[in-house]
């Protein structure tokens, strides 16, 4: 099973509650249909059929009969799983759902993973969470993830506790819940909990910053990180977003990191584009000139 699909499945099953047993049954029935119905198997495992078309076949076949969660999960799997691996992937989904059904109310902790695999799982999980939100709610998640990344960046003790896999997951999740409960949206807490149980906590700050970027992409926007010695007001942020949007030909959402070391001016990053208009840079260049002339 692709890590992307596994992450999406984890998000679907997290919110299933008493419907998990039904999902297990429906996944099993679909897996059996792939075995017994040649025409269905041929269409869904044909790599020349467009992924969106494979997804549409699943949705048309199951919509109105199976639960909405099952339809979403199997449609996503048909779209993103390698066509030749669809049947084994569905079988793996049955096993995953059975694990969740056997431990109701418990979060399924993922096995350890490398950076790429962990990011793919998290992207799949976030895809499902964002599907359930409107644009304003996605914006709020992005804001809260950014605030959390800044808090972790400046609070080493908190970062260490949350990243320490020798501490049981439930204890670390409790710390996170105490921190966010009543302050953050349920979707933010849900994503943050998955980060802790996703098999890789080595770079929590970078991971939460990446989620901010995913939230921006979900709205068809680019993320701009701006480092400034002082906070920017609403009007300044709006002007900056407009100017950067013209530059990259996309709508831009701006997140500001207050960094006194820039002295003055701004350091702007939009993907690979970096614009350094800081006083710090000008001072460094002046020092270089003075060093050469002495």
Residue ranges and their predicted role:
Residues 1-294:
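Elongated, mostly alpha-helical coiled-coil "stalk/stator" tethers of large membrane protein machines
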């Amino acid at each position: 099973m692709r890590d992307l699909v596994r992450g999406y499945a984890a998000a679907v099953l997290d919110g299933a509650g008493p419907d998990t047993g039904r999902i297990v049954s429906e996944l099993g029935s679909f897996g059996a249909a792939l075995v017994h119905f040649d025409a269905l198997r041929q269409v869904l495992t044909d790599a020349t059929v467009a992924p969106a078309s494979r997804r549409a076949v699943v949705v048309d076949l199951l919509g109105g009969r199976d639960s909405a969660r099952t339809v979403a999960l199997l449609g996503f799997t048909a779209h993103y799983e390698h066509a030749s691996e669809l049947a084994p992937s569905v079988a793996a989904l049955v096993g995953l759902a059975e694990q969740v059904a056997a431990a109701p109310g418990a979060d399924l902790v993922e096995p350890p993973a490398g950076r790429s695999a962990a990011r793919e799982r998290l992207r799949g999980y976030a895809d499902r969470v964002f599907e359930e939100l409107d644009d304003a709610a996605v914006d709020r998640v992005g804001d809260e993830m950014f605030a959390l990344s800044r808090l972790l960046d400046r609070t080493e003790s908190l970062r260490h506790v949350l990243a320490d896999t020798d501490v049981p997951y439930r204890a670390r999740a409790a710390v996170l819940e105490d921190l966010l409960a009543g302050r953050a949206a349920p979707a933010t807490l849900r994503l943050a909990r998955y980060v802790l149980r996703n098999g890789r906590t080595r770079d929590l700050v970078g991971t939460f910053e990446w989620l901010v970027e995913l939230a921006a992409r979900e709205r068809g926007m680019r993320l701009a990180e701006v480092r400034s010695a002082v906070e920017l007001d609403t009007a300044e942020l709006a002007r900056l977003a407009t100017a950067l949007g013209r530059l990259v030909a996309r709508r831009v959402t701006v997140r500001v990191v207050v960094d006194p070391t820039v002295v003055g001016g701004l350091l702007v990053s939009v993907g690979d584009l970096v614009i350094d208009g800081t006083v710090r840079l000008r001072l460094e260049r002046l020092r270089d000139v003075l060093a050469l002339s002495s």
